[in-house]
Amino acid sequence: MDTILALTGITKRFPGVVALRGIDLRVARGEIHALLGENGAGKSTLMKILCGIHPPDEGVIALDGEPRRFANHHDAIAAGVGIVFQEFSLIPELNAVDNLFLGREWRGRLGLRERARMRRAAADIFARLDVAIDLSAPVRELSVAQQQFVEIGKALSLDARLLILDEPTATLTPAEAAHLFGVMRELKRRGVAMIFISHHLDEIFEVCDRITVLRDGQYVGTTEVARTDVGALVEMMVGRRIEQSFPPKPRLARDAAPVLEVDALQVRENGPVNRFALREGEILGFAGLVGSGRTSSALALIGAKPARVRRMRVRGRPVRLADPAAALAAGIGLLPESRKTQGLIPAFSIRHNIAINNLGKHRRLRWFVDAAAETRTTLELMQRLGVKAPTPHTRVDTLSGGNQQKVVIARWLNHHTRILIFDEPTRGIDIGAKAEIYQLMRELSARGYSIVLISSELPEIVGLCDRVAVFRQGRIEAMLEGEAIEPNTVMTYATSDVRGANHEHA
């Protein structure tokens, strides 16, 4: 094997914790090597060491057989190590060319920037990536997929021999992800080595050559993709086999009382009109392709998106949800798709994030908060939901994605909200945490909570939901339940002009 990267015995300690303990990793030239592990397994820390962001406390980094010690990120870049972070590092106001050459502009003899030369170089890079980029437009005006390719182009413009891709498909459509995989295969053909981090095992089996698994900061093993299967990988990741991710569905009474009734909801002017109801203890799926209207309809329910509605009732009482505050008062809560930017205050503690929706719950006198009571409530919710963190005072931006999602759920439970809208609840979390979220959602429904689930993951829709509203071009094409909830039927209604009996669904 023509090894380009060899990590040997990498150990990293932070105050009070050993983040990595004796990690070994070998990556071959022209190989796509998957790095797997649950959130908190040590993947990010290991990659930050490789990129010069953190120094290792023990161990050796070798590139092409030569030991290296990176004092900073620039040293790693100079050695040919590039990384595309899950959260982009682009300057939104600058165009793609300026982002590619930021801080290292090409200049002529008089010190003037050689704009035409940099533009030609950028055009050549994107041509090699087989992607069309408007080189004059600010990157904020580009699609998420195009921004992803600008990040990759930036790394390649630095002559990266080893490219780290951290969850690169997290915000891409299936077609965009397929294009990315084609680009990765072409880079592989040219001899570029890649470390691919993803929670989607199907992607790893599609594009990777070998897999290294970490668990709890330790090396578990390396295997060839062709010699393993999903069950074996999951067991390596979590230390146990997860035979069934989805808890069994209970049999709900068809005449269960509706807790939310929506009559004639129209999200856009002259758009389709939908009617539906959510029953007590039910998980109702909103399925459909991106842009089908499922998310905009859910946002309209909490007053976060302007919409027309003839009538809306919560537990039989007419309500008018003009804004999220009115929805909160009516007992409707949203767990947004973007936890970090919309669902949490990252720099705040677990306690403060949970308490923020219900500050009056533990108020003393008029203006003072009983901090001890808040802490007790936070501890109870952490134990109830299985939030893994040292204390209630831990900052949420230090938690894994699964634990962050549990904190968002805890916030709504602290407010006694009984109608919950989960928007892409498992995006960016590992397979073990996904199973915990699925179990938690089913436990909540068994206790009488009513849930709307929006998900692009078809197995989640099929495996969790009691009924499924399938959206297409803003219209509910069908309301499926029972044995009708199966992948082919859902996709048929989501992609074809097939109408359910009518568009008034109770």
Swiss-Prot record:
It catalyses: D-ribose(out) + ATP + H2O = D-ribose(in) + ADP + phosphate + H(+). Residues 5-241, 254-498 form the ABC transporter domain. GO terms for molecular function: ABC-type D-ribose transporter activity; ATP binding; ATP hydrolysis activity. InterPro entries: AAA+_ATPase, ABC_carbohydrate_import_ATPase, ABC_transporter-like_ATP-bd, ABC_transporter-like_CS, P-loop_NTPase. This is Ribose import ATP-binding protein RbsA. It is an enzyme of class 7 (translocase). It is found in: Cell inner membrane. It comes from Burkholderia mallei (strain ATCC 23344). Its EC number is 7.5.2.7. It is a peripheral membrane protein. The gene is rbsA. Keywords: ATP-binding, Cell inner membrane, Cell membrane, Membrane, Nucleotide-binding, Repeat, Sugar transport, Translocase, Transport. Part of the ABC transporter complex RbsABC involved in ribose import. Responsible for energy coupling to the transport system. The complex is composed of an ATP-binding protein (RbsA), two transmembrane proteins (RbsC) and a solute-binding protein (RbsB). ATP binds at residues 37-44. Belongs to the ABC transporter superfamily. Ribose importer (TC 3.A.1.2.1) family. GO terms for cellular component: plasma membrane.
